[in-house]
């Protein structure tokens, strides 16, 4: 589930920027609620991230906040009983909001999804940004603007949500204080337990493979995997000249705290020029070049 959730997080807010990867830090939360849960997909789940690394999760079945590795081995980082109680309270409010939206649209029988993402960033130990937004069935629903401060409705049903969440002036001030004070404070508290993991550099392993059907062009694939941080440069060269990839280029989580990426080029049958995969990553002292050996051809 984590890779899918991380993709949603990137859509909902700027929690994991390349600048963050360069030494700044972020704390963010992703909530997902389902009107019709099914096996393996509970009605509510929450995942918390430090930078791009999930560090605890919670769902409506276990109703406990549970730290993920390597934070599961850390003592004193968080009071997990207290965090569990907080997540249970947030679950109740979150699912009540989903129910209100379904009532507004008079669709209690449909299958609907409500998602929320919020968090903050530190740069040089100072607050440098924050976000808080929700989506309903994949469409923007409501967001918090801390500069006004106010909830900004992005859907007709969100007018009701705004009225409810702004019924008392203190509600808005609490949301603003959370983004500007509480969230950065939590992040500062977590960092002494987390910097070693978040600042680590893991070099990519690189594999080049090829396949050709009789009478067709040869397809070369360069796969880089098990690298961290996320940013990587990856391309094929022909006799030293960079080639445009036919496919690939995305950087995806591997599920173990590292990333993977690949690029594919097509080579005409008559082309005998040397091809190499060129890799640039922060963990490497110099770019890595891995030549394609035609003897490795996979039939």
From Swiss-Prot:
Q: Which residues are glycosylated?
A: 24, 125, 256
Give each disulfide bond as a residue pair: 120-183, 222-277
Under the heading Pfam families, the entry gives: C1-set, MHC_I
Q: Name one GO cellular component term.
A: extracellular space
Q: Which residues form the signal peptide?
A: 1-17
Q: Where is the Ig-like C1-type domain?
A: 204-289
Record's superkingdom? Eukaryota
Q: Where in the cell is it found?
A: Secreted
- InterPro entries attached to this UniProt entry: Ig-like_dom, Ig-like_dom_sf, Ig-like_fold, Ig/MHC_CS, Ig_C1-set, MHC_class-I_related, MHC_I-like_Ag-recog, MHC_I-like_Ag-recog_sf
One biological process term from GO is: antigen processing and presentation of endogenous peptide antigen via MHC class Ib
Give UniProt keywords alphabetically. Disulfide bond, Glycoprotein, Secreted, Signal
Where does this protein chiefly localize?
secreted
How does the annotation summarize its subunit structure? Interacts with PIP.
Chain's role: Stimulates lipid degradation in adipocytes and causes the extensive fat losses associated with some advanced cancers.
Q: Which family does it belong to?
A: Belongs to the MHC class I family.
Output this protein's name.
Answer: Zinc-alpha-2-glycoprotein
Organism, as annotated: Bos taurus
At the highest ranks, the source species' classification is:
Eukaryota, Metazoa, Chordata, Craniata, Vertebrata
């Amino acid at each position: 589930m984590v890779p899918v959730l991380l993709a949603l997080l990137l859509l909902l807010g700027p929690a994991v920027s390349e600048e963050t990867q360069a030494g700044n830090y972020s704390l963010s939360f992703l909530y997902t609620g389902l009107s019709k849960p099914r096996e393996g997909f509970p009605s509510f789940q929450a995942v918390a991230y430090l930078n791009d690394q999930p560090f605890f999760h919670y769902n409506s079945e276990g109703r406990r906040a549970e730290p993920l590795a390597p934070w599961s081995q850390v003592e004193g980082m968080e009071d997990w009983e207290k965090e569990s109680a907080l997540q249970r309270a947030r679950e109740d409010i979150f699912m009540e909001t989903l129910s209100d939206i379904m009532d507004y649209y008079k669709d209690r029988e449909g299958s609907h999804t409500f998602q929320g993402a919020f968090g903050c960033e530190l740069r040089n130990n100072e607050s440098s940004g924050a976000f808080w937004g929700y989506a309903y069935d994949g469409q923007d629903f409501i967001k918090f603007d801390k500069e006004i401060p106010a909830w900004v409705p992005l859907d007709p049903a969100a007018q009701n949500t705004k009225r409810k969440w702004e019924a008392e002036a203190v509600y808005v001030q609490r949301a603003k204080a959370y983004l500007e004070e509480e969230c950065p404070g939590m992040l500062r508290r977590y960092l002494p337990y987390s910097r070693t993991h978040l600042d680590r550099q893991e070099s990519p392993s690189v594999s080049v493979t090829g396949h050709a059907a009789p009478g067709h062009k040869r397809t070369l694939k360069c796969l880089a995997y098990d690298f961290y941080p996320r940013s990587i440069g990856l391309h094929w060269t022909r006799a030293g000249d960079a080639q445009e990839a036919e496919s690939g280029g995305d950087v995806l989580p591997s599920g173990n705290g590292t990333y993977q990426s690949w690029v594919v080029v097509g080579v005409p049958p008559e082309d005998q020029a040397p091809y190499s995969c060129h890799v640039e990553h922060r963990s490497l002292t110099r770019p890595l070049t891995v030549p394609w050996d035609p003897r490795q051809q996979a039939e």
